[in-house]
Amino acid sequence: MAKLYFYYSTMNAGKSTVLLQSSYNYRERGMNTLILSPEIDTRFGSGKVASRIGIESESVSFNTSDNLLNLVRNETRINPLHCVLVDEAQFLTRTQVRQLSDVCDDLDIPVLAYGLRTDFQGNLFEGSEHLLAWADTLTELKTICHCGRKATMVLRVSESGQVIRDGEQVQIGGNERYQTVCRLHFKEAIYQRAEDELPLLDSNEPRQSER
């Protein structure tokens, strides 16, 4: 029986690169793949998945109201499909995650989903939350923080480089808006008060980083 796979990570771990390589491996063997990408992500143009190392492929865009089971079923009426790959899977809805599981169970087509686990506040995305619960296989794609530790979190930053703590969960951007960090540096950036927020700059109370 086909399985639902979820490859998760923070940003800059090569998720899209792995997706494109997986699709290439299928196609090299004469098999057909379908790449899905959320229409909200237009960093590289509509209907396209691209990696930071310069490779790209066309994709079929979807939005949160689309029925992905029906979308895939319609594609199989044109050509047989051997694998479905989903980029930026954190933007899936709970219902769409279930529909992808139906692609595996009803159509017997494996689904490989790639996405972020948590947002800039350390909270799970809707799609990631339900993929973590429903996927048959979970795989973490790893990258590193500037300190050398494994990076598991992401910070949203302003144009001036200041950490943004509040705002909408979804805001499309790349390295100019987000920084990949370990849990320690995430907590320091999010929870430690900036100097200009301290009530008394000459207070003898030690800062968190000095404790």
From Swiss-Prot:
Enzyme class: transferase
Subcellular localization(s) per the UniProt record: Cytoplasm
Residues the entry annotates as binding Zn(2+): 145, 147, 182, 185
Keyword Metal-binding in annotation: yes
Pfam families in UniProt: TK
GO annotation terms (biological process): DNA biosynthetic process; thymidine metabolic process
Binding-site list for ATP: 9-16, 87-90
Family annotation (Gene3D superfamilies): 3.30.60.20, P-loop containing nucleotide triphosphate hydrolases
Reactions mediated catalytically: thymidine + ATP = dTMP + ADP + H(+)
Active site: 88
Keywords: ATP-binding, Cytoplasm, DNA synthesis, Kinase, Metal-binding, Nucleotide-binding, Transferase, Zinc
GO cellular component, one term: cytosol
Main location: cytoplasm
InterPro entries (alphabetical): P-loop_NTPase, Thymidine_kinase, Thymidine_kinase_CS
GO terms, molecular function: ATP binding; thymidine kinase activity; zinc ion binding
Protein EC: 2.7.1.21
Self-association and partners: Homotetramer.
Family label: Belongs to the thymidine kinase family.
Name of the protein in its database record: Thymidine kinase
Name of the gene: tdk
